[in-house]
């Protein structure tokens, strides 16, 4: 745990929405009088028919039910577009930056309105109506946002499948929500390479025969694609014939807005269902307060819309707030390792939100590529996706933000809909590696294995004691699995699946997934702690730690280590790293095996696939499970070869 504290500076607090005192009073009223608090803040979005009921929720395992603003009627698309037209019609809604640095475009709110309405009318012409599901399988191009908002406009439920997923994964997700229509592209671009999309979509549809009736295809690369007459439609040709005006469907607050399939640790992917009203209130409010977003600023979240971060913090939250949001098709390392910072300068980005894995890989390339750019417009930096180790936090703060930008280290999940624990720039003193304090209305608790709520400084499992507006409502067509997965371990509480430590200041430190705990000779060790220690070593760029069967200790510690550019692995360095961790955490945390790895297996969103690393450490090479989400499968082959020898 880092013992450094960075107090709120006068610069951060002078025009922030909340300071420490206001946070305290708002938080207290949000948990003591939720109906009053959310009754007021629910009005931040426009309602066709205002709600009279605010909160109606139960975490009782026999009757899990979550309803917010349940008698209100609204539309997400009009909240993200139409309500801004009178005052912000000519303002840029979306800045799109292509994979190729020479390709970018600005889309105003007026243009966004026209594109979304045309696509909504096309969807209707192909028989899509309120309650139908539409699968979106697109690269990071503006059409992905248009498709989401067009579905929302007519009350269709979208299910986005990340463009890096295989035909098998796509087919399973189409079958999971029975989409009659899919929107895809001929191909995508990523890091200078073409990514097959229509080929995968064709293969997926074959696997789930009889479900998909229509495939709308965006021309992205102009590459040759197979064509099925009567089913396949070119996006541009269909839109050219459609009206640029489409009335918005009146949606109940509790109508589903989207389904997002997330991998279960076992079994089929889970279709997380998010609502309309509560979700949008939360996405817009967290976007404003957590990033301290101010009108006219340029906001960039580097995620993909295929992940929940892209849903909430590229599209819905920012656009509901009338923001200018940046969509990036490329990768941080193409054409050069300074790409992120070049984009920041090119588009004068004020708020930048990315993942620890990207920060660590950029840190591995040294300070030079960052310092070659200006970044003077940056005001707030954010981190999302996994706990950020203090070493990477410090680098991000010192080198990228030049010690003038607060870092909001945000903790949340696909299931939570939006940020639950995070600093607020004008209110929260920062501790590198800590997600700090809960957002309004969020009641975290730390419990022990028996479910006892722990007070004061402690370590245990993180649960949330009561509901918040953006909480997932159910798993698609499987409410029983929803109750089982999230409410049965600690009855009456939402179980996050994450381990957590709370310090003497009441700050929360996420220690990683509960299944990422190693039991060494009866001592429970969070893998995140050992990883942070390794990454703090000057020669280490990235580390992933897993447990493996050990004759004496029960479990041993297996550390995969990627070294900084230019550093060669050696037996001396291996010993040095073992003693480094031993000195930093204690003998109990000393790695038993240090495996120098040129790369780690990651999903396209940058998460390290520890499940695969565990299997390799255990030498269970034939039981790796689903590897379709890997960004670079060759990494796994290399690791297996090295482990086998």
UniProtKB/Swiss-Prot annotation:
Acetylated. Deacetylation by the SIR2-homolog deacetylase activates the enzyme. GO terms for molecular function: acetate-CoA ligase activity; AMP binding; ATP binding; metal ion binding. The modification N6-acetyllysine is found at residue 607. GO terms for cellular component: cytosol. Pfam families: ACAS_N (PF16177), AMP-binding (PF00501), AMP-binding_C (PF13193). CoA binds at residues 190-193, 309, 521, 582. The keyword Metal-binding applies. GO terms for biological process: acetyl-CoA biosynthetic process from acetate. CDD domains: ACS. Its EC number is 6.2.1.1. The keyword Translocase does not apply. Keywords: Acetylation, ATP-binding, Ligase, Magnesium, Metal-binding, Nucleotide-binding. InterPro entries: Ac_CoA_lig (IPR011904), ACAS_N (IPR032387), AMP-bd_C (IPR025110), AMP-bd_C_sf (IPR045851), AMP-binding_CS (IPR020845), AMP-dep_synth/lig_dom (IPR000873), ANL_N_sf (IPR042099). It catalyses: acetate + ATP + CoA = acetyl-CoA + AMP + diphosphate. Catalyzes the conversion of acetate into acetyl-CoA (AcCoA), an essential intermediate at the junction of anabolic and catabolic pathways. AcsA undergoes a two-step reaction. In the first half reaction, AcsA combines acetate with ATP to form acetyl-adenylate (AcAMP) intermediate. In the second half reaction, it can then transfer the acetyl group from AcAMP to the sulfhydryl group of CoA, forming the product AcCoA. PANTHER family: ACETYL-COENZYME A SYNTHETASE. This is Acetyl-coenzyme A synthetase. It comes from Methylocella silvestris (strain DSM 15510 / CIP 108128 / LMG 27833 / NCIMB 13906 / BL2).
């Amino acid at each position: 745990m880092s013992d450094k504290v960075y107090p709120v500076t006068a610069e951060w607090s002078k025009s922030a929405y909340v300071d420490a005192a206001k946070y305290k009073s708002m938080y207290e009223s949000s948990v003591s009088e939720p109906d009053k608090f959310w009754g007021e803040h629910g009005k931040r979005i426009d309602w066709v028919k205002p709600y009279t009921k605010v909160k109606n929720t139960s975490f009782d395992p026999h009757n899990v039910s979550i309803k917010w603003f349940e008698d209100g009627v609204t539309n997400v698309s009009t909240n993200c577009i139409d309500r801004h037209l009178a005052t912000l019609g000519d303002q840029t809604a979306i800045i799109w930056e292509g994979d190729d640095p020479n390709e970018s475009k600005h889309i105003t709110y007026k243009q966004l309105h026209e594109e979304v309405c045309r696509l909504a009318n096309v969807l209707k012409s192909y028989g899509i109506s309120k309650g139908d599901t539409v699968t979106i399988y697109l690269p990071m191009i503006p059409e992905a946002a248009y498709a989401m908002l067009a579905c929302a406009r007519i009350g269709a439920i979208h299910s986005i499948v990340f463009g890096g997923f295989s035909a098998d994964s796509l087919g399973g997700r189409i079958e999971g929500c029975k989409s009659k229509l899919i929107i895809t592209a001929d191909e995508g671009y990523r890091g200078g390479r073409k990514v097959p999309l229509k080929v995968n979509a064709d293969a997926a549809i074959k696997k789930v025969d009889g479900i998909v009736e229509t495939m709308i295809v965006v021309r992205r690369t102009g590459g040759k694609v197979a064509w099925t007459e009567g089913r396949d439609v070119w996006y541009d040709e269909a839109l050219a014939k459609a009206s640029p005006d489409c009335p918005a469907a009146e949606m109940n607050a509790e109508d589903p807005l989207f389904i997002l399939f997330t991998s279960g640790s076992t079994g089929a992917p889970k279709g997380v269902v998010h609502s309309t009203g509560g979700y949008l209130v939360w996405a817009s409010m967290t976007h404003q307060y957590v990033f301290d977003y101010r009108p006219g600023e340029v906001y960039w979240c580097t995620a993909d819309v295929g992940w929940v971060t892209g849903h909430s913090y590229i599209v819905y939250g920012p656009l509901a707030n009338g923001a200018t949001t940046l969509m990036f098709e490329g990768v941080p390392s193409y054409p050069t390792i300074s790409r992120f910072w070049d984009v920041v300068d090119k588009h004068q980005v004020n708020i930048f939100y990315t993942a620890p894995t990207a920060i660590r890989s950029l840190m591995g390339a040294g300070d030079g590529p960052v310092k070659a750019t200006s970044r003077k417009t940056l005001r707030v930096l954010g981190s999302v996706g996994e706990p950020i180790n203090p070493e990477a936090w410090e680098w991000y703060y010192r080198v990228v933000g030049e010690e003038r930008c607060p870092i909001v280290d945000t903790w949340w999940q696909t299931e939570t809909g939006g940020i639950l624990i995070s600093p607020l720039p004008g209110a929260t003193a920062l501790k590198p590696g800590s997600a700090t304090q809960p957002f309004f209305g969020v009641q975290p608790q730390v419990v022990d294995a028996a479910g006892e709520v722990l007070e004061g400084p402690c370590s245990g499992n993180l649960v949330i004691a009561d509901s918040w507006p953006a909480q997932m409502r159910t798993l698609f067509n499987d409410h029983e699995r929803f109750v089982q997965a999230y409410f049965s371990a600690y009855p009456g509480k939402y179980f996050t699946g994450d381990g957590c430590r709370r310090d003497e200041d009441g700050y929360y430190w996420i220690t990683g997934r509960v299944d990422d705990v190693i039991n060494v000779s009866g001592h429970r060790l969070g893998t995140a702690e050992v990883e942070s220690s390794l990454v703090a070593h000057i020669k280490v760029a990235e580390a992933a730690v897993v447990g493996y069967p050990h004759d004496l200790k029960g479990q041993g510690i297996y550390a995969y280590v990627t070294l900084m550019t230019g550093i060669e692995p050696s037996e001396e360095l291996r010993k040095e790293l073992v003693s480094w961790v031993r000195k930093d955490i204690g003998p109990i945390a000393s790695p038993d095996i240090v495996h120098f790895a040129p790369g780690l297996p990651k999903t396209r969103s940058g998460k390290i696939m520890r499940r695969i690393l565990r299997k390799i450490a255990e030498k269970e090479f034939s039981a790796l499970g689903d590897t379709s989400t890997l960004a670079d499968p060759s990494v796994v082959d290399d690791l297996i070869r090295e482990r086998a020898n």
